[in-house]
A protein has these predicted regions:
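Soluble, non-transmembrane alpha-helical interaction regions
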Residues: 2-80
Length: 80
């Protein structure tokens, strides 16, 4: 069964990603409202979105590696 802390960490990463996407969209929409050209604004948004996705994926990998390391340490610990 999954540890509550593990689920909490996963949710934090996804919540942070959600917030970042919201911020990116607001910047994108505001730029369009200010008269920025659509094509460059869209490219900038897409590039920022890719970086946010990459950061989310790397963070999830790190969380997963930490979970694995903790599980291995518990398994290797002598039974009391």
């Amino acid at each position: 069964m999954a540890n509550t802390d593990d689920i909490y960490e996963d949710r934090l990463v996804f919540a942070a990603y959600d917030e970042r996407v919201k911020e990116l969209f607001k910047v994108f929409a505001e730029g369009l409202a200010q008269g920025e050209p659509e094509r460059p604004s869209q490219e900038r948004f897409r590039r920022a979105l890719r970086f946010a996705q990459r950061a989310r994926n790397l963070a999830m990998q790190a969380v997963q590696q930490e979970k694995t390391a903790e599980a291995e340490a518990l398994a290797a610990a002598p039974a009391s």
